[in-house]
């Protein structure tokens, strides 16, 4: 049966809701903006409130007989060649947890790349899953981690034949991509499922010059944040499933366990609209973004002291398998300024927001929403940054450990350490103790310390010096990291 991608069930249902002038005696209590605070209405506009209706008993009837959401999800699945798709309004942080709970349970093993996002670790804590960490490919020269390779997963399965499946992150926030097809083959040779955290890859299915995406590569579950590289609203996420290793109803059940019973129709509408936009114009829009990104990369490379990381930097033996050029990662070590200091200056003095920031890099993601006006402002700001860089060089330095020093020993299950008896100790006394909390430089959100890992002096020094240089640590109990929560 042919699929009509000009349709957008959620958006159409919202139009119908307004046309009918339905009178609501249900939540939300603002009653189509009438009860909202005037100052909020002035800032947000009434359109936000007019679109904020119940999914069941509002957008659809109380028994969801119109199947508004189901039809939108089927269209999304068709657009990206998945067998089944589910929308979520709690971000991929929820979606990836639901995927993990569909594959492994308490005290069961799951192979996980150690470059996973903190939401994956949260899933381990909640479920009591035992992680078998698969080491990323470390680029010691650039102090950067790339996804593990198929042979890394094969070795981990050989050492842990009782593992229930695997999870890999690809692309990374830096744009480095794994050999997903090879990893899927390793998993499927054992009749085990592969989960791909593809939060940064919503755009990948829509242009042949972009890296292969998870469903095409044979993954069983793929988690995607439509709000990151797509046109969705914040928290808009989908997960796709295919094959016979993870029943779709099981995945939906696990998502229902974690998700809200009051999903945002606004977020659903953003997901539905993104799918239609990409199904009808995706190749054109992504092609334009790729051309623009290539121009921007070339222009930045001409600025003294700046270097744009490219395929030659990220791909090759012992590195990543593929590369997404839209996250424009700029190495600014040549101008002697940390990424933290540079990002703060760009925001304060040029009103330019950078996304990814670390001790030597800043990142500007280029999407189909950019044009030569936005990128022109970016380039002008970067030229000015390079010019005034000598004035910013008095910032504290970050003591970055070697790849071997960054790897901590896991001596307890994350869940056991997180929920067990714990105490706060001065950071000077924490080395050798077992962490009872996550400590995560953000962005990109990859924990440096996990619950259950044995703390070491190099990692603690890295975090303390990073904090002094401008690193953001959102999760430790002591935000100044003068103390650390450890297992008693």
Which ranges hold each PLM region?
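Conserved N-terminal alpha-helix of the aminotransferase class I/II PLP-enzyme fold
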Residues: 44-94, 115
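Conserved PLP-enzyme active-site core in the AAT-like
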Residues: 7-13, 19, 23, 82, ...
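Generic beta-strand/beta-sheet core signal
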Residues: 113, 134, 169, 197, ...
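Short acidic (Asp/Glu) and glycine-rich catalytic loops that position anionic groups and cofactors
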Residues: 248-252, 270-279, 321-326, 356-362, ...
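N-terminal "arm"/small-domain region of PLP-dependent enzymes with the aminotransferase-like
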Residues: 1-67, 444
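Short, glycine-/Ser/Thr-/acidic-enriched flexible segments
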Residues: 32, 173, 228-229, 244-246, ...
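Conserved small-domain helix->loop->beta segment predominantly found in fold-type I
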Residues: 284-363, 367-368, 390-409
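PLP-dependent enzyme catalytic core of the Aspartate aminotransferase-like
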Residues: 345-349, 355-488
